[in-house]
């Protein structure tokens, strides 16, 4: 644990503000250097003197507390190795998402490149507001991180989603951020992701419901661990992960050709794409008119199996990981068969029902063992999968 890290705590105005005292106190006791910014509304719930005593630093409550001769807001933004906003309110989240910097907290966040966490706490109706959801989604694309609230009793007397996550869990999340190591430093990883689209005519195609989220989570987490990542992706609505070289394709053949051109340059290949098994043998030159056809027969031909080709042609020190999606009844058996048939080092087995979901439940399988993971967010699944590489 690196005790030389600096943590900036931003406290917003909400009934959960008082819980920040425990978090600041705990981080100081652990040896971290902690500074606190409070919004004006936060000072209505808890006194700055309390936080000043605990943090052993002057509390900033507005821009005029800063020494402008030193461009202090920039100095503090650079000082922070991590920013935690707690409780993150509807107002503050929305201001940051809109690029508004009208107080000390929003100004410093706007000038910082440090990992920034928003620990959300608010009324359940406010939390479900679509405007807030869009703002959170927007901020996530810029790598802001969110500690989602729990269900519990709220200030409005409702028992609903919106209660600040347990303080010890928040502290654990912060410590995990600092404890990340470059376990995959300079490792070259190739990942295939999302679905492919096989044209029937100029506007219609065969495809599936894969979103690419699992592959993109793997790419993002691998970058955090120091890897050099290239992702070959089919169509997706996922945001491009930062620090990743991205190759975009549409069809299975395009993915196959791109993968074969470069896979021997990588130490690790992960086939997370849901590649179409078949494609139309012929593509209609123009849109098919239903008024001219009573029955339509389309002859299909097999697409090449990308990960199988790589598995059987891998270099001596390459690790090849595949994915297998099946119904739960035959999942493990089918995965074992594919592991052997495709000459893979590992295969990740998951049920079909998780296609298009933010969650996943997988089994990590190799020749010697089967590791079952509980249902969890795909970003967490990605972390667990990557652990097999170090």
Swiss-Prot record:
E.C. code: 4.1.1.36, 6.3.2.5
Q: Name one GO cellular component term.
A: phosphopantothenoylcysteine decarboxylase complex
Q: GO BP, one example?
A: pantothenate catabolic process
Associated pathway: Cofactor biosynthesis; coenzyme A biosynthesis; CoA from (R)-pantothenate: step 2/5; Cofactor biosynthesis; coenzyme A biosynthesis; CoA from (R)-pantothenate: step 3/5
- Top-level taxon of origin: Bacteria
InterPro entries, per database record = CoaB-like_sf (IPR035929), CoaBC (IPR005252), DNA/pantothenate-metab_flavo_C (IPR007085), Flavin_trans-like (IPR036551), Flavoprotein (IPR003382)
Region ranges (Phosphopantothenoylcysteine decarboxylase): 1-188
A Pfam family the protein falls into: Flavoprotein
Residues recorded as binding CTP, renumbered to this chain, are: 277, 287, 304-307, 323, 338, 342
Query: What does the cofactor section's free text say about binding?
Result: Binds 1 FMN per subunit.
Name the needed cofactors. Answer: Mg(2+); FMN
* Reaction catalysed by this enzyme: N-[(R)-4-phosphopantothenoyl]-L-cysteine + H(+) = (R)-4'-phosphopantetheine + CO2; (R)-4'-phosphopantothenate + L-cysteine + CTP = N-[(R)-4-phosphopantothenoyl]-L-cysteine + CMP + diphosphate + H(+)
Q: Where is this region: Phosphopantothenate--cysteine ligase?
A: 189-390
Q: Which UniProt keywords apply?
A: Decarboxylase, Flavoprotein, FMN, Ligase, Lyase, Magnesium, Metal-binding, Multifunctional enzyme
**One GO MF term attached to the UniProt entry:** metal ion binding
User: Which residues constitute the catalytic centre?
Assistant: 156 (proton donor)
Check the record and name the HAMAP family matching this protein: CoaBC
State the protein's purpose.
Catalyzes two sequential steps in the biosynthesis of coenzyme A. In the first step cysteine is conjugated to 4'-phosphopantothenate to form 4-phosphopantothenoylcysteine. In the second step the latter compound is decarboxylated to form 4'-phosphopantotheine.
Q: What does the similarity note say?
A: In the N-terminal section; belongs to the HFCD (homo-oligomeric flavin containing Cys decarboxylase) superfamily. In the C-terminal section; belongs to the PPC synthetase family.
Listed name of the protein: Coenzyme A biosynthesis bifunctional protein CoaBC
Native organism is Borreliella burgdorferi (strain ATCC 35210 / DSM 4680 / CIP 102532 / B31) (Borrelia burgdorferi)
